[in-house]
């Protein structure tokens, strides 16, 4: 139907952008960005326990038992999600200064990978490469007696960790440690062991952010003081300064030269400008990590009734793609996939 006659003559406008916003069908026809379940990578926490444990700071998330993990990955598959990333909650008794449990081929993550590949062979399995879940110091690298996070010594251990994960069946290795040169070293180590087919999704621009708090609670992986040993109180000597943008381009160029297959920006929501810059600079796929703090804020506001959770989540995920991300790591993955299916 034609709109009611205007009370005064129409303005003489050559182009009216609202013409293409008039109906849902028209808006869908000219929509520039599309969101689908295939865009999501679903982060999952796993522990040695026989039952699943709710994570207080991340409502709706669990530390999954191996049986629970298998069931949850099956649910994700049924919703159209095709990639999960695994993070271990390691028992304190297995944590050491060098994090050697990280390359134990009988450890939690290798067993979880093998189990998932047996039951859900089509699911893409991404893993995390860093020492912090395995370190009694809570850092991504080895901490010297002087309180310095050692780069090259750490990279040697990360290579062993990556190979152990690949041997278990991992499809994508995700170095989140932010040590210099680790992408090239891991690529070389994988190739030498016959894992040329295993990809690297590098945490290229990982910022020393305040948005990681709930994640560290989930894994008990925050830096911690040790008797008689100075421990850096944060990760600012290896993760990026939130004030820097050009530095992200340098990191991206290095990762691409060293053989990264996919590059990631973490956190995502407060760093949409970085996602956009990397998209302009590189032809590699770009991933954005919708991190635990971002997730927790949405959940808390939704619980109070202050926001429409469904609308806010889908808008947030769409914004990552609009900024230039091809893939999105998000704890909202299953909810978002279900909402997209509902239309």
Give the location of each predicted region:
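Alpha/beta enzyme core
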Residues: 23, 35-41, 47-343
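Short, Lys/Arg-enriched N-terminal segments with co-localized hydrophobic residues
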Residues: 1-10
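N-terminal amphipathic/basic leader segments beginning at the initiator methionine
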Residues: 10-31
């Amino acid at each position: 139907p034609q709109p009611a006659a205007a009370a005064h003559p129409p303005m003489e406008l050559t182009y009216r952008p609202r013409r293409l916003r008039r109906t849902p069908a028209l808006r869908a026809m000219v929509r520039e960005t599309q969101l689908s379940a295939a865009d999501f990578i679903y982060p999952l926490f796993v522990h040695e326990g026989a039952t699943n444990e709710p994570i207080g700071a991340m409502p709706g998330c669990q530390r999954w038992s191996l049986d629970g993990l298998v069931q949850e990955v099956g649910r994700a598959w049924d919703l159209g999600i095709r990639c999960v990333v695994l993070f271990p909650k390691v028992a304190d008794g297995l944590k050491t200064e060098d994090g050697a449990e990280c390359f134990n081929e009988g450890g939690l993550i290798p067993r979880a990978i093998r189990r998932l590949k047996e039951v859900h062979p089509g699911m893409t399995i991404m893993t995390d490469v860093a020492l912090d879940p395995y370190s009694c110091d809570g850092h991504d690298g080895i901490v010297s007696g002087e309180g310095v996070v050692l780069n090259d010594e750490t990279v040697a251990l990360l290579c062993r960790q990556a190979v152990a994960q690949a041997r278990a069946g991992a499809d994508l290795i995700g170095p989140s440690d932010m040590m210099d040169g680790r992408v090239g070293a891991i690529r070389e180590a994988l190739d030498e062991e016959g894992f040329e087919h295993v990809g690297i999704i590098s945490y290229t621009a990982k910022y020393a952010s305040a948005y990681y708090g709930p994640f560290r609670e989930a894994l008990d992986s925050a830096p911690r003081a040790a008797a008689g040993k100075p421990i850096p109180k944060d990760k600012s000597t290896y993760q990026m300064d939130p004030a820097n943008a050009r530095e992200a381009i340098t990191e991206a160029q290095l990762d691409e030269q060293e053989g990264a297959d996919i590059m990631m920006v973490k956190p995502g929501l407060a760093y949409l400008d970085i996602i956009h810059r990397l998209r302009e600079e590189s032809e590699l796929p770009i991933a954005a990590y919708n991190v635990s703090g971002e997730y927790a804020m949405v959940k808390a506001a939704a619980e109070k009734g202050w926001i429409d959770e469904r609308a806010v989540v889908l808008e947030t995920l769409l914004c990552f793609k609009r900024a230039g991300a091809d893939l999105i790591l998000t704890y909202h993955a299953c909810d978002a996939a279900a909402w997209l299916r509902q239309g």
